Every structure is written in C-alpha cells, then in structure tokens.
Amino acid sequence: MRENQGRVQALDRLRGLLVVLMALDHANYFVARAHSPGEYWGGVFPAYATAAVFLARLVTHPAAPGFFFLMGTGMALFASRRAEQGWAARRIRCRLLLRGALLIGLQLLIVNRAWELTPGGWGLRIYIGVLTALGAAMLVAAWLLDVKPLLLLIPASGLLIATELLTPGVSRWADPFHPILRLLLIPGGTRALWVNYPLLPWLGLTLFGLAFGGWLNRDPTGARRGTLWIGLGALAVFVLLRLGNGFGNIRTRSDGGWIGFLNVVKYPPSLTFVLLTVGFSLVVLRLLFLIEEGTSSSWDPLLVYGSTPLFFYMLHLFLYAGIGRLFAPGGTSAGGMLLYWLLGLAVLYPACVGFRALKRRQNSRSPLRLF
C-alpha cells in the first residue's frame, strides 16, 4: 500500500518552520562563527553585546523542544493510522523501536561526522546530540502508546519538575559526574563524552506530545482549538516564573533587562525554557490549523521541509559546514550569514522535494519510510 494520506498539514508546517529556524542557528554556527556558548545549567552563561545577536539565538530556541513534542504527537497519530490499516500493536511498536534505534545510530555514525567539521576543530570523542535523545525517547515512549492522554501528563510533568529539583547547583559544573548521570540528566562532560541532550528532561516533552497526539485522535476539534489557550497559558506561567526568579529557572537571572528576562537555561530544559518555547509553538500551531482549512499546496516550502525533517537535518549540517569552509573560512557578517542561510534553504528545497516523492512511492514496509 502506497500512502501519504492522513498527514496533518499544520503539524508538518510547524515542523517545517522549526527546521528552518534550526538551520538559521547552524548557519550562524558554521558560517558566521558567531554562535554563543550554550545556555547550560553551570559554567559561564552567554551574554550578548547586541539585541540582534541575541534575537538570532532566541528565535531558534523553539526548534529542539518542538521536535520532541511533535515526535510524540506523530507517534500517537502513526499508531492510530496503522491500527486502522490492520497493523497489530506489536508491529506498530516494533516499527517505532526500529526508528528510535536508527536515530541513535545516525547521530553516532553520521551526524557526529558533520560536527567534526566545526570551525577550529571539534575534539569530542562521543557526542550525545539531539538525534540520540530523540531516538532514546522514542524507545521509551513506544511502550506507552496505550496509556490514556491524561495519565501521560503525570510522568511528563514529573520529569520536567524532577529536572528542576535534581539539576546540581552552578558551583558543581566542573564535578566529575558518572556517565550514566550525564546520559540521563546532567548535560556537560569531558572530551571523552559530552552530553547536550540527556534523556529524562527531553522524554518529558515527548510524553506531552504523545498525550497531545492522543487528544488529537480522540477529539480533533477540541485539540485544535485548545492549542491556543494552552499556549497562551504556558506563556503566562513563563512570565510569572521569570518574575519570581526562583523555581523553574534552574539558575537565576542577574541581568534585569529584557534580554536577561528571555535568556533562559536550555541544557537541560528549564521549566521557563519549555513554557516559552512550547507555548510559542502551540500558539503558532493554532494559526497553522486555521491556515490549513483554506490552503493545500503541496509545494509550500514549510510542508516540504516538514515532511522530510530527518533528511533535511542530516543534509543541512554538511551543507552549512561546507559553505562555511568554502565561502567563509574566516566567518562572515550577520547579513552575509543570512544570505548563506537562505541559499542553503534554496539548495535543500529541491532535494527535499525529490526525497519526499521517493518516500511516497514506497510501501509502508519500506526502510525509506523510517527517514
């Protein structure tokens, strides 16, 4: 059976928007060489000389949490569609487990080769990046497909709150934590093992997405309308927690300006980071649901990118790394970086169109449908 029915265009468009923003961040890293240090729980926290430099980083923040949330949502929708086609629960779970393992393998075997092209050298032996955490979260969430959406909110919330409570204080940044703690909870490490995306904090976002996908399956109209109010509510709670400058922030802010207010801890994702980014994405998703009702162009770039996110991800890293090495070996201005970012998107568009067409010609058993 060849298929491409059942896809929710608004989800694909949101995913497409997120990968475009992610590409901006990586163009900044590989081409402009102006990327800030990460927003870690310890160590030196990034400071920004200008609002433009900060905004170039801020607008990309929704990407990572959005990927985990949308992956969970997609898992619920995939399981529902395949069950309607007669797939047994075991077969559905095995398919998801296989894809989770694939994501981990791609990170360690291929994607890390792109990061080795980092300007000035890489130097890390093992890097645990976003695909590793996405794959590990899928391996866990695949066993929770039958849990009711409301019940999923319990472990999802618990994991995010536990992240706040269990993350060490800033003064312990240089402590030699056990590798298992690194992989599960505490970002950082050494050249032998560096973890940006530990499993447990990001698993919480996946479970929120799985719950939303279950809601979308059971009550599509209610779920579509609810995204706006949940998103606005999340943004309101973000403001309250930032004003409180205590629980929910992992590390308190010292800068009283608006940049300091919006400059939140990402590694691991603080509650304020999650509320800000997911709240924004849900508000955008509501707008995309409204747009979906009146448009259906399959050539929309966001739809194209959003229906081939893994292919886009792997290709764009090597593309921008190559652009940086060939055309901007000494870095470039912000304006030049934006031009190279757009050039990269233009190159990626026909490649993603072609890969999408190839996938659509495959039956549901094809390994290509894992990408």
Regions found by a protein language model. Name each.
Residues 1-371:
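Alpha-helical transmembrane segments and their immediate juxtamembrane cytosolic regions
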